[in-house]
């Protein structure tokens, strides 16, 4: 198959922090669907890769569900609901969107959605019945047949809120039943009669909000599982009541729990009884799910097993005892340690041999059943990522991993996991292998100082410098199959790891002696409540990516320095290519606060303050030869600073203002968000909210800016949307033109090539842009090209091919407000 020009090779993300944003397709090889920001992500847990993104919502995706088939085969339809008040029905083909239909009518965010297939009047005819609940206190019902969607009904709950809905077909009939979990502590049952849902009865018993309801059919009976904030799970049995249950006077037993349905002209009495109450969780139970039916040896199996997830950080697998029929806890799994707050949701997968939980901070926890001991479950590797907008990212200097920062107050490191398959073929997948910083402020920017050292800035006045511990370097070398001696070239005294003291924000370095002297568990139990901070770091030798529990506690990097000098929150930071200088800037509404501070990476002292801009500096970048520092600002101008060669080695080089624009000479009419240099130091590129990208130059340190002013040297490129990120590839295309990646506020990424022409017309050439499934769903925050090296690593051997003119495949990473980090590969020969 011929590869396309632009491909998404790796995606890092996690589910939204809401209940119901997770659904696992039934059948072998079923995909896991979850909502990430405004997108629906389809993830393959077996291959550990994201298959595609479904972009259609304009606000957060709150709930979704695969429409299950009767025979247990994988479904190709799913429904999702979001904070944009919409429900979207997705139809897939080969795991790609074939068509999508928007169902509108709700006047508030959709919080729950469910759908089933219902048989039509003709044999073999089916249509989808969809129910959705929203914060407008209504449940809306739709019917979808083919490409036609028909609105059926609205169920009003006045001042109440329905938090969960579930549809099913009454056994032996074609009558749908709808269960609605309400905030009045009751479950309301509705029966469809003459195409309209009518209330049948309400089930009482729970003492707090109903968080989840789900039906399952076992023979002629229908079972309903419900969970609540009262920490309990209730299982209700719904069955057709024979006429023999009637007493002589015609009254019915359990009258309050019976109702009558009419199907095909025949009236039938249906009874509902409480089967059992399950008490095992110690906090709110947020989700409960029956194990889906599946085929085994050609026979459709429906196991009687129930999975529940709770805010007590545990997930329990329940099943009735074979002898007594009493429901018992079979398996309990969960989180241990860390700053976590329990589980939002859970799902069965792979015929019940895998279970997954969705944690409060977005993390997924996957467990797989042992084939040797069925009662033993082991954690598995699963996708991870930020749960809030990703603000910045950087490749390490050798292009072997990326570090990202986010307003979720974490810094994360993603790297390739290189392993051999059963046929001894090399396989590469990317995973989060470290979480160097878990902070108390939103982290806004970072810069790599060295291969294993970076500086980050957050919504505080301090810059923090981190250095990798020995345990990380050792594990990284094993996971990525790199030479440890190449990484630890000298015998420096590296700390083993780091920990955060109680009520602290600084990662404290831990050395071998600190770990050896830590108390035993018994001593920890009797330690004073306000004594010294407990050591939680435990060094571990890993040969595969770590689990979420390990990431939370054992992958912090020690903080080696704090840099004080700014008066407001840090906005951007940059490091020069020789790794000797840092430049940083903070929020500012006055010139004195908008000054750029230069720091020495040798002494960690301020070298110089560069004052020019009157508002916040949004991005800075050093030229590849380190002779210039470029800054762009919210004041719609840029400034170019030239390094002065020091007359003596005792003095650090300093920068002087070389060129700038003002309100008259500035081409941009709105905030300039981004800038970057061409690899030959001649030109620099600026991108602005005014939808323009401009090339400026030429820049020569020997020129006098008065005699050779730096002006626009390109035609103005209008990309049709606000430009939020610009990045220039370090290599040229085969035609020796500059390759420029442009990130837009719409989430799209466009790649252009540019070359200076005498007429400044036709100098821009559009090469390729991301399609809807490849794009981010919200604004791009940063783009960064990978440095090109001879040992380029990726999934395919083709990626390592080098021609005399350069590599065939180029790689760049992107991050955005949609919580997602993506790595793309581009065919250089096609640009």
From Swiss-Prot:
WD repeats: 56-100, 105-152, 158-200, 205-246, 280-328, 338-377, 385-424, 438-476, 565-609, 612-651, 667-706, 718-762, 775-831
Pathway given in the UniProt record: tRNA modification; 5-methoxycarbonylmethyl-2-thiouridine-tRNA biosynthesis
Keywords from the named record: Cytoplasm, Nucleus, Repeat, tRNA processing, WD repeat
Subcellular location: Cytoplasm; Nucleus
PROSITE patterns hit by this protein: WD_REPEATS_2, WD_REPEATS_REGION
Keyword Metal-binding: no
Disulfide bonding pattern of the chain: none
Listed GO biological process terms: proteasome assembly; regulation of receptor signaling pathway via JAK-STAT; transcription elongation by RNA polymerase II; tRNA wobble uridine modification
Function in brief: Component of the elongator complex which is required for multiple tRNA modifications, including mcm5U (5-methoxycarbonylmethyl uridine), mcm5s2U (5-methoxycarbonylmethyl-2-thiouridine), and ncm5U (5-carbamoylmethyl uridine). The elongator comple catalyzes the formation of carboxymethyluridine in the wobble base at position 34 in tRNAs.
Record's subunit section: Component of the elongator complex which consists of ELP1, ELP2, ELP3, ELP4, ELP5 and ELP6. Interacts with STAT3 and JAKs.
Family the UniProt entry places it in: Belongs to the WD repeat ELP2 family.
Entry's free-text remark on domains: Folds into a two seven-bladed beta-propeller structure which is required for elongator complex assembly.
Record protein name field: Elongator complex protein 2
Organism listed in the record: Mus musculus
